[in-house]
Design a protein with these regions (language model features):
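Non-catalytic, well-ordered alpha-helical scaffold segments
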Residues: 5-9, 24, 33, 38, ...
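Long, compositionally biased
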Residues: 43-70
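Amphipathic, hydrophobic secondary-structure cores in small proteins
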Residues: 16-18, 24-47
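N-terminal acidic leader/helix
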Residues: 1-26
């Protein structure tokens, strides 16, 4: 479980940098949408093989889409 949590933290921080927001704000917004558990943790096996830059783009885009109701 440690690896999944470490991966999620790295993805959250990298996504926050992409969006120009704090890690806390990114965490709060992802948490509100259920994306930490349902995207980063549950899809760890699939996502951790990608580059951190790719994961940051993916989680940022997913967050914006979910917030927009897409």
């Amino acid at each position: 479980m440690y690896r999944r949590i470490h991966f999620a933290v790295m993805a959250i921080e990298s996504g926050a940098r992409k969006l120009g927001i704090s890690g806390k704000e990114m965490h709060d917004r992802l948490s509100k949408q259920g994306l930490i558990q349902n995207r980063l943790i549950k899809r760890y096996e699939e996502l951790h093989t990608q580059s951190l830059d790719w994961v940051a783009d993916d989680i940022s885009e997913t967050l914006l889409n979910w917030e927009a109701g897409l």
